[in-house]
């Protein structure tokens, strides 16, 4: 099974990707995690990616397509995968299609801008594992085994940067949505909008019902 999760920053894609991964034993391919890992390397390419991320711009299509395509095609994903944060543009979507990997489900996570900013203000990351946490929407029990002082704010979670990313997302999502709605007409792909205002648990239940053909 091949699942794609798209949506703006802070809409819960990463959280649901991890939950679905545990439930269905599918590996997560997270563009954000991959790029942040590259950005920590003391290389010219690592510095380039770091500067792009910190500026709030999207990594150019030519670069991100190459990175994700290599990841998808050159590693062992025989049982499928969960693709978190790719594609973000129509060019990326077409390139994913050209890999001839049959995407089964596309979930678009939708959340009002005001709530996106509220969530991002309380979002932290474990710099070692790359796991993202939210102290407001996640239960304390999920964080009790962590030393909170080891968690850090993401460098790209500053207000001006998020504003830029949201503008880019709003510009691209219209075409991306049309692309997958059209694909749904001609292929077995199924496209669903997910209301991210619901709790983590309820969002997860909704997605699982769709995957298990109960909705």
From Swiss-Prot:
Region feature LID, mapped onto this chain: 122-157
> What's the Enzyme Commission number for this chain?
2.7.4.3
Know the name of this protein?
Adenylate kinase
Instruction: Please verify whether the record's keywords include Amino-acid biosynthesis.
Output: no
Q: Give the catalytic activity.
A: AMP + ATP = 2 ADP
Report residues binding AMP: 31, 36, 57-59, 85-88, 92, 154, 165
Top class in the EC scheme: transferase
What does the domain comment read?
Answer: Consists of three domains, a large central CORE domain and two small peripheral domains, NMPbind and LID, which undergo movements during catalysis. The LID domain closes over the site of phosphoryl transfer upon ATP binding. Assembling and dissambling the active center during each catalytic cycle provides an effective means to prevent ATP hydrolysis.
Compartment(s) where it occurs, according to its Swiss-Prot or TrEMBL record: Cytoplasm
GO MF annotations, alphabetized: adenylate kinase activity; ATP binding
Q: Tell me which InterPro entries the record gives.
A: Adenyl_kin_sub, Adenylat/UMP-CMP_kin, Adenylat_kinase_CS, P-loop_NTPase
| CC annotations in GO | cytoplasm
Q: Which family does it belong to?
A: Belongs to the adenylate kinase family.
Q: Which domain of life is it from?
A: Bacteria
- Show the SUPFAM superfamilies listed in the entry: P-loop containing nucleoside triphosphate hydrolases (SSF52540)
Tell me, how does this one assemble?
Monomer.
